[in-house]
């Protein structure tokens, strides 16, 4: 998919946080603990959740699914087809994180990549983003897998 190691680590740090996972443990079958709306390692919600379930079904799967390959495939599909977006709540992160997908793919800073992914793909409210935890997970992933 052409992502730098730093951008990939930023994605992993976000997925670790979103799925309630810990190092070496991204939970593919995670369900949001508050209201059950978000599902999967990305915590797809609302319309995105409906589309994700349709994607699973079109590939012979149903929810819950532990098929990490399908979840990654769908996440990358979303990123390439309109879900890499700067919306109102993204602005709290700061304008410097409003990067194109191509710029993100080439990112060389783990912390920047983590914040950019959170702002443009996860799109959680800044005050609830837990960026310290996301960034710690991303830095852990980068240190563990760098140049492997």
Regions found by a protein language model. Give the residues of each.
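Cell-wall polysaccharide-cleaving catalytic domain and substrate-binding groove, primarily
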Residues: 1-61, 119-148
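Non-transmembrane alpha-helical segments in soluble domains
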Residues: 12-15, 72, 76, 114, ...
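Peptidoglycan-targeting cell-wall enzymes and recognition modules
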Residues: 19-109
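Extracytoplasmic mature domains of secreted/periplasmic and thylakoid-lumen proteins
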Residues: 91-93, 99-122, 128-137
């Amino acid at each position: 998919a052409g992502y730098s190691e730093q951008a990939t680590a930023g994605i992993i740090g976000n997925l670790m946080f979103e799925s309630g996972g810990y190092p070496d443990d991204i939970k593919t079958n995670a369900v949001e603990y508050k209201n059950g709306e978000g599902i999967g390692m990305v915590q797809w919600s609302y319309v995105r959740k409906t589309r994700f379930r349709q994607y699973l079904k079109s590939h012979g799967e149903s929810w819950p699914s532990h098929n990490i390959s399908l979840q990654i495939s769908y996440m990358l599909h979303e990123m390439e087809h309109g879900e890499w977006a700067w919306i109102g709540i993204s602005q709290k992160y700061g304008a410097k994180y409003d990067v194109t997908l191509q710029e993100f793919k080439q990112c060389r800073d783990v912390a920047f990549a983590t914040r950019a992914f959170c702002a443009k793909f996860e799109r959680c409210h800044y005050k609830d983003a837990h960026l310290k935890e996301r960034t710690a997970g991303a830095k852990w992933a980068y240190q563990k897998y760098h140049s492997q």
